[in-house]
Amino acid sequence: MAEPEKKRDQPFSQEKDEEKDLYLVHDEHESPLPLTVTSRVLYMLGDIASGPAYRFTQWLDLVRKRSATYGSSGFPHRLHRIDDMVTSAGERNTDPKSPPSRQSSEISLWERLGKASTVDIDSSCFSWNMLSSLHHTEHSSSTDHSEEDQSKPLEVTVNSGGVVFFALFNSSSSEDASRKEEAAVIKFASSRMATQSERLGYEFSKWLGVQIPQARVIHSCNPEWTLIKEATEKAQAKATSEGDEVGEMTCSELLEALELSRCLLLMSYVHGCPMLESMSSFETEEKAERAAAALGRILVLDLVIRNEDRLPCRQLRWRGNPANLLLTDRIVSSAKHHECSFDEAFDSAIKRYHPKDYRSIQRERRASSVDSRSRLSISDQMLVSQASDFSDITESPRSYDTGLMSPMSDRSVAADFHLVAIDSGVPRRPPAGKRASDQEIYPRLVELLLNSSQYSSNLLHEITEGSLGYPQAEDGEETSNVRSVVTPVVREFRNGFRAGLRDLQEFHIFLVTLHQKLDVLLRAFFSMMDKTMCADFDREDFAVPESPSHTHGHEVNHYPSPSKDRVPSDNSSDHSESDMQKSVPRTPNSENKEDGSSPKSRESWHGRSGKGGESLSSQRLAAKLRDFHKFAKVDAESNKELDQWNETLRNEVMKLCQENGFNTGFFEGSDNNSCTDAYELKVRLEHILERISLISKAANTEKPSMIQENLFIGGGLAARSIYTLQHLGITHVLCLCANEIGQSDTQYPDLFEYQNFSITDDEDSNIESIFQEALDFIKHGEETGGKILVHCFEGRSRSATVVLAYLMLQKKLTLLEAWSKLRKVHRRAQPNDGFARILINLDKKCHGKVSMEWRQRKPTMKVCPVCGKNAGLSSSSLKLHLQKSHRKLSSGSVDSAMNMEIQKALEALKLSTGRGSSASSNSFQSHPG
């Protein structure tokens, strides 16, 4: 402790000299020892700002030491709950342990930030000349915090890490005299890629309807970078003249960060506090429902980008960070009626799918209200849980409401209630162990969240740390009071999750297209590199294997080298499957078909996996990409080739993104980095598509309908939803469509006991022949204490027929009673005409009379009463036939002939109703006698 005390006594000038020496001592050829594998790859790509990553790390250590000496730039101790916030400093509780000067400084800044309005960083009126002061949080280099340290503000170092500065500007607007200042946030990450990845994460947030602050990346090559330096120097001079030593130090640190970094992230300031720290987040049921709906969308976002630093979830092994989900009572975007992130995502979707309607929608809609009905894609029914259980629909009446509003629209979130997600960086490549874990956890979580209210409630309880939802009772009992309060909240949570899945499906195809575009261009680029550097590198080591996007059935364009002198050859080699993939067991939702966006088919593009998820081939490509950049500096022809490829990659990818209204955050800096940006973006997209594939497959699920406590009915989707079956306790599966494609591949004899029958859904099929054997299987399941699922392909005809036969033969119900019981919980049940006749005969055999009358579904052929020929299926066809073939008949005779035909049809069907009788929605009708 003595040495740090001495350092604190050293003058600032000496510390600054030490810092300069630290940077000058660095040798370009030294290996950056502190770097991880990922950082080494980024270093080889030339990504680390102004040198190796440890420069930024060591500078950050110096900043932390200064924070220990000079305090937190006046930033208040740990964000207080909204309930504890007051408008005046006199009403606020003070910490007696804090020095008076520091305490007053913190209160002063807290008041300034609270009263400041939010800068519209995208406005043309935004100017750095209005910058008045800079502040930043305290920094902590230790992960173990004492109780005293936990009361201090935490540095925002989640995902991308780095340093966060709070910038206060003099207000340029005189609309509100009480707000003389405006606030914004400046964030420096440890690398250019980390900054761009965070901007990419915000883009995903916007497209998924998650509320976010405004954010944009500013690169050092941008003229705005110089304006920031000049404004900071002016603010530093102002702080010096006022004797503000801390303010001067903060400005100095920002200038140092500008020298070290190649880009920064500028964001709008969010007035609020962590959601879980606010007692008002869930004080009313209405607010709780709105928060739950927003959390459903945020969960989809974090599953896609694999962000484990926001929502705590033991099942997903996410540690969570409540500070990255803020509750605010102010609109996040600018006060000048700037559209919120949900509106921007909606606009992008409309521009893509209905460009002609975009202008009219813009004119007609309100600035703060968006009807999400227009945002639903045609694939809603595929992604929304296809639950046929009527009890589930009763519990969740709005689960199928196509008018579901976005959690960020004015109908679902009041003007004084917003949940804002911050720090949504997209990781480069998750470790192999986490990827393997995701492949096991994702399918189960998504499937059960869609199909089980109880599971959804438990999950909501976990991610809100007990604020919403309810834990699973140890004795399995739940009070009616708890259920009545929680059910609407859980319903909104599931609705928000479903809405996020729909939005995800909307731009999934675009992401696949973008990945394929990058894949084709980079393959050609790497082939050119291989040809250019073949004298220096092992061709076999550098050969680019066949990309999965080429073998996935998509026709892609081949891009020749931009240079006319060099035509890259297609050097492809077969790579063995990833070791990580070989070690991953087959999950129940996995299929034999390989998806072009699946990790299994893509892994060979990069070769075998190394430690930490870094593939060895990827490391070689990264190293050779770095070396090729060095080689191009001394070889004029290679330099020209590289410039042409940078331009081609940038133009092709940017064009595709602009056409679809998508901002990746990449390709906005120097043109010399386009090849590197393309490669890094592709790596991130691969793993995003991998997770989207897991989510989409799991979302294609169905909850079986419960006929009685131990008997369920469903379709093929229900039979494949094994996590749902296990959750329901199903042990036996009666399959009536074993001969159909894919059924044998989706059975799991290690988990369930199967009885397979091959019955076609035809009227002539003798389904009666399997009744006894099927009933014996069901009876066997009941006797062993199990639960049985009866399913066919669609869960409509064959399975419904067998269940009705079981209820009549085993439970002694009449056909009418069995039909009512089945239709009450499984509304799509509809035996075909042939099966219906069999059931009617069975009803008469068991009870001596028919309790229901059959009404056939298929229309009968209209036969001409004059000549006896088939005229068609409709009455209009018969009338046309009479007019053409029997012209001598008068119009009255035609009507008479029509009446004759109708009378014959009525007699054949034994119906007492007249010509104008309406059709029943049921296949069966109660017997009139």
Swiss-Prot record:
Chain intervals for the UniProt region annotation (Disordered): 1-27, 545-618
EC code(s) of this entry: 3.1.3.16, 3.1.3.48
Subcellular location: Cytoplasm
Traits of the deletion mutant: Embryonic lethality when homozygous in the phs1-2 allele, but after several backcrossing, phs1-2 and other homozygous alleles (phs1-4 and phs1-5) are similar to the wild-type.
Effect of L909A: Loss of nuclear export
Example GO biological process: regulation of gene expression
InterPro entries in alphabetical order: Actin-fragmin_kin_cat_dom (IPR015275), Dual-sp_phosphatase_cat-dom (IPR000340), Kinase-like_dom_sf (IPR011009), PHS1 (IPR035010), PI3/4_kinase_cat_sf (IPR036940), Prot-tyrosine_phosphatase-like (IPR029021), Tyr_Pase_AS (IPR016130), Tyr_Pase_dom (IPR000387)
Principal EC category: hydrolase
Protein name per Swiss-Prot or TrEMBL: Dual specificity protein phosphatase PHS1
